[in-house]
Amino acid sequence: MYQINISPDKKFCDISPALYGIFFEDINRAGDGGLYAEMLINRAFDDGVIPEDCTYNADSKTITSATGWVSSFNCAETEGIYGWTASGGAHMALTDKDTLNNARKRALKIRFNGGMIVNCGFEGISVKAGCKYRFYMFAKSEKCAQISVSLMSEYGEVYAQQLLTVEGDYAKYECMLESMSDNNKAVLSLSSLSTDLVTIGFSSLFPTDTFMKRENGLRRDLAEKLIALKPAFLRFPGGCIVEGFSKETAHRFEDTIGAVWERRPHWLLWGYNTTNGLGYHEFLQFCEDAGIDAMYVFNCGMTCQARCPDYFDDELVEEMYNDAVHAILYATAPADTEWGAKRALNGHVEPFRCLKYLEIGNENYGEEYNRRYKYFYDKLKSEFPQYTYIATDHTEKNGLLTEMVDDHFYSDPIFFATNNGMYNSLGQNDVQIYVGEYAATIGCKRGNLYAALGEAAFLTGVERNQSKVKMTSYAPLFNNSAYTAWEPDLIVFNNHASYSIPSYYMLKMFAENRGSYVCMHNVITDYDKRYEHGVFRYTFNGEAIIAGSTDENSRSFSADVDIINGRLTVSFWSTCAEGEDQNHYDFVCEDGKCTVIHYNGWSRETICEGHCDLVGSFAKVEIDTNGDEFEIRINGSQIHKATLKAVPHISAVCTVDEATNELVIKIINITERDITVKIISDIPMTDKALITTLTAESMQAGNSFDTPKAVAPVANEVQLEDGKINIGARSVNVVRIALR
């Protein structure tokens, strides 16, 4: 039986206007060559510079930080000039002796000798006939050198060409290039007959058709896809890049404002360099242009704790604190103040009004974070009380003042579907929640319908709890298809096209159909058990237990362990996968505490907690599993017995749209069969409904460059018979029914 009972005139909670937002992090080359419309790769020539305090291994093409974190590094300057090639007798080399300014680490010295140098762009430069592109460079030459700037095919066919005359010390030289042809694999070439030395300190190529026609702007099609989601806010700039994996790679606001050629570069822990062209100013400008709120995330004095962390000393913590303060003042101070004047100099005289949220760190936790969080929160709240401050851990559990906590979940779709009641038990006086990063990842790397179904089921629970869960944002946002570091991502692009995964369309449906308030309702549904499988893995104080044993079907475990004097960890139903694909349940026994935790993807869920007071040291530990049940005994006494949460066939949430006098019902069917749902309302409904449905023939169905809308919403008007509506298999649905 499937039924939704609704009381439209009984308000359960108000909607949170900020519930659906977006989160940008420069991952998968989402910045330069992506949302930031720059078309030249390595435009500042410093991509191959090894970050300070890191060592380079040429054999493995990796760098290692001072604390031991190893990261890919495939563009070392000792092995070529990344993105640039020379031909026809031209010779080029990098130098650190004659750079454009103190922010630039390298310049490019060239003797053309009748030849050319070429930039390949981001897997090619995409040009269109009749479209214009603005090129500029800072260059110098002791003698007059005439340089041809061309857009051309990789085979030498010229589409646009202009001549620049370079002479004397560094100066900015620019020109407009109008292409005569279409080509997604074009290149930019600089050529000259000169044999004299020419030095280039910075270069850039931008389309003139950017979002809002801004000169240092955003790629229009990608920005418009973001706005189509109707976001309430934008979280920026990360993500793990805020922390970095070393002191030098930690994010600093002051490196991201001013003329782009005067901004320090930033080696990102995702394995590439950014020139910070898409910086703090551009972030605020986009929020203002889009009419949305801004959330700024800043480093609180520590690097990424998942990457051999480094905890900054008090002096550097204070430096990071001042960096955060300066960012706030840059956005909001009058133009006649120090930081307001810097903003005005960059073209925005009036303060930005969009800054609303400040997040202290990213994915930080533990004692080191608590100490830094308190320092930042206490001082900032005193000086800037008007903002909402967000913690990255549940600092309220340690007695710290906490306004909002940023929860992150990367798991499989079933984890999301079974946890749609995760926030039901939160009290009205508990801390507010921001689900700042979430995505179904396991089995969904390319982005498919299955992921959207699980996420949608989870979000119905979030919508029911908007008095406690105030904001959400999917992550990551963008993926350049040629530079993938993380999947799935909401929007996939190359240098000329883009498409959105099914989760994008699900979120668009949800954001466009908010209603005015959540009304009282209850959902009646059948369930499927969550059957787990996998092997046992067990350790004591970090080392394997020799005496432990499991049966041949991996359904039971037994071991004699000195659990009073150590830490016992038994993983069961373990698939043995690591990282984001992991799925296992850990029984952890230490200091009399016995806890079962489910690790799924990058998420963890406490299944049960308890205590065990033992007489003597050694104990017999036994674990039995059976499909969706487990029992744990110590010395024959039952410590835990639990059944996993079942998977609801349908998940739903109901709001009332007061402007249209309609019920807005979001219904997710995660099964492989059609389901008839009866809708019963305390207030009479009309017998017609508008139903918008996201579905496909397969759970694995997704979109691509060739079929960008293979999985996209379709709207239909349907007739209700006795309040019954058909909800198709594998579908996300928004049903709107007028009240009489």
Language model segments and positions:
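Extracellular beta-strand ligand-recognition surfaces/modules
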Residues: 4, 137, 173-204, 341, ...
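Aromatic- and acidic-residue-enriched carbohydrate-binding clefts of CAZyme catalytic domains
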Residues: 22, 53-56, 60-107, 242-280, ...
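Short carbohydrate-recognition loop motifs
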Residues: 95-114, 531-544, 593-598
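Extended acidic/polar, glycine-enriched regions
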Residues: 115-228
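Catalytic-core region of carbohydrate-active enzymes that cleave or remodel glycosidic bonds
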Residues: 377-389, 397, 403-404, 408-513, ...
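C-terminal beta-sandwich/jelly-roll accessory domains of carbohydrate-active enzymes
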Residues: 533-534, 538, 552, 577-580, ...
